[in-house]
Amino acid sequence: MDLTGKQVLVAGLGKSGIAAGALLKKMGCMVCLFDGNEKFDRSAWKKTYPVFSDCPLWIGELPDAAVQEMELAVVSPGIPLDTPAILKLQAVGVPVVGEAELAYRFEKGRVAAITGTNGKTTTTTLVGEILKKCYPEVFVVGNIGIPYTSIVEKTTEQTVTVTEISSFQLETMETFHPSVSAILNITPDHLDRHHTMEAYIRAKESITKCQTKEDTC
């Protein structure tokens, strides 16, 4: 995936957004930044992350003029897709993907993905430890607290990446294709975001949408 010279918006400047932005800069993108929190301390944040000192940063509201200039938007999982900024981007045809989807597009190895309402972190950690006994290079990432984009450059054809995937992350997956996936359980959760249990279930089940008969779920 060649993003050199592309103008890319990173929406949400927490851990995932920072990692995604850093990867995009390394890939030669023109990175722009947005956070909807009107209390966001622009000055302090840029001092903490000087790598983004030359990046335009919008707080609270995303200007229409900026929306028109974007060629891709990378959204942190904590940002609902029905927020005004995301709806603006989609309305003018800007592709919107999540941080994990962005990372996967640069993945060189195989992926094992785990989702579910409860037990994701424990299972992901355990699977990672087991695979480390069998494979020379294993990364454990995702909703477990380590952004996928922070390690994906290190992957090789010999790598196995074990990733914990939340329903929020699955909402913005397009090409994500794990060799092995697991849905642990599904009980009512995050209905303030998904609105209905049916939508929540669909989000979880979408972990398999790019899998084929050669894969395992």
Where do the model's predicted regions map?
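N-terminal leader/targeting and accessory segments in enzymes
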Residues: 1-98, 102
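Phosphate-binding loop of NTP-binding sites
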Residues: 22-26, 65-68, 77-217
